[in-house]
Swiss-Prot record:
Biased composition (Low complexity): 35-45
Protein name in UniProt: Meiotically up-regulated gene 176 protein
UniProt keyword Cytoplasm present: yes
Gene: mug176
Location of this chain's protein in the cell: Cytoplasm
Native organism taxonomy: Eukaryota, Fungi, Dikarya, Ascomycota, Taphrinomycotina
């Protein structure tokens, strides 16, 4: 007989259906409402079990903390309580006090305390001071250096003459002293009312035009080098908004001093001549100082002799505008007539041949003769082209065209 302690094993009943058929049939046989209710109940049970476990863990942690506190109260003679405050400070870690962040940088090995932002005197340094500066000066010096460089570049662009200390002295003329000083101040230059030769704030540039002898002597005797410039340099800097090189606009004060001394001795040498007085002096036959000195280089005159000391302006103008001084190529008949007239004049006045040399163009083309009709046609076409593009009487080109005699 089987004992009471032994458990009866249930007999396996044969499944009348195929494998999986009974399971599928059982699922289909259960309605959908019952399945949904069973799943929701299982989820609620899981949540309840998790909350119970969490509460139990919290209770155990609180019990452990209470036990630790009770032990410390029961044992008042703790060796740690008798330690010095310095040892307690050493037991703390910096990582527990100062939390890392993106604004705090780690201290490098080569860090020196002189680079600190909040560093006080070295004698008052506390070895247990945990509030060491976390940002060295190297990081801030770079940013400050970048800011200063950018500000300097902006000032140079706006005020290119910021480093210039100028003194302006302009007399009567085409330049205005007020306009030049205003342009210098707009460009950032400091304008001085007088020449300051001190080393603290000396004058670096002197804008001069028709200045006095005293200022020129001061500039030439100054120990500090001063750049003397004309007002055109200021106009160039103002138009370009840039510090233009002074080499093209330099002024030598010694040369100006020499001219000033000459002007005081004989003022007529430097004063410009009046055009009306100039023409009267040339047309006046009694005044022949210029023509007496250069009589050897003059061309022969038609109505004059080289021995005479007087000069007739009308004869000179008639000679320059005569047919002998016409420009371009001349035909054969005209050239022969002109050569005949010149030969007759030379025979009548043989002394002129020895004293005055002939023109070079007459010597070059005296032996030239037209032999064929083709050359004649070429000359005629050239003459037509010349007449089409003939310069005016008062044109400067007329003086440069060479004379050709055939």
């Amino acid at each position: 007989m089987p004992s009471l302690n032994q458990e009866e094993t249930p007999k396996k009943t044969k499944n009348p259906y195929r494998k999986g058929h009974s399971r599928r049939q059982s699922r289909h046989s259960i309605p959908s409402d019952e399945l949904n209710s069973n799943s929701s109940k299982s989820l609620n049970n899981d949540r309840i079990s998790r909350t119970i476990e969490n509460s139990l863990q919290k209770e155990t942690n609180s019990d452990n903390k209470i036990k630790k506190l009770s032990k410390t109260k029961s044992n008042p003679t703790n060796p740690k309580s008798e330690e010095d405050p310095s040892q307690i400070c050493q037991s703390f870690d910096e990582s527990n006090i100062i939390t890392p962040s993106k604004y705090l940088f780690p201290l490098s090995k080569d860090y020196s305390p002189n680079e600190g932002l909040f560093q006080t005197d070295m004698n008052e340094k506390n070895p247990h001071d945990l509030w060491n500066p976390t940002v060295p000066m190297a990081y801030l010096s770079r940013s400050l250096q970048g800011l200063t460089i950018s500000k300097i570049n902006e000032t140079e662009q706006k005020f290119p003459l910021s480093s210039v200390h100028a003194y302006v002295e302009i007399g009567e003329g085409m330049f205005s002293m007020e306009i030049v000083t205003e342009q210098l101040r707009l460009l950032g230059a400091t304008v001085h009312a007088s020449l300051q030769m001190t080393e603290e704030n000396p004058v670096s540039h002197a804008v001069l035009y028709d200045c006095s002898q005293e200022t020129l002597k001061k500039i030439s005797s100054a120990q500090v080098p001063i750049v003397c410039v004309s007002p055109k340099w200021v106009l160039a800097c103002y138009s370009s908004k840039y510090l233009v090189d002074e080499e093209m606009y330099l002024v030598d004060p010694q040369d100006i001093l020499q001219t000033k001394c000459l002007q005081t001795d004989d003022s007529e040498l430097l004063n410009p001549l009046d055009p009306f007085t100039d023409t009267q002096m040339i047309q006046d036959p009694s005044d022949a100082f210029f023509f007496d000195t250069q009589a050897e280089n003059l061309e022969p005159f038609v109505n004059g002799s080289p021995d005479s000391h007087c000069f007739n302006a009308d004869s000179f103008l008639d000679q320059t505008l005569s047919d002998d001084y016409e420009f371009g190529l001349i035909t054969c008949s005209d050239s022969n007539e002109s050569s005949m007239s010149n030969d007759a004049q030379r025979e009548n006045n043989p002394e002129t041949i020895s004293q005055i040399s002939l023109s070079p163009t007459a010597d070059l083309f005296s032996s030239f003769k037209i032999t064929t009709d083709l050359e004649m046609t070429h000359l005629e076409s050239a003459k037509k082209k010349y007449l089409a593009y003939k310069p005016l009487i008062g044109s400067p080109l007329k003086k440069k065209v060479s004379l050709i005699d055939f």
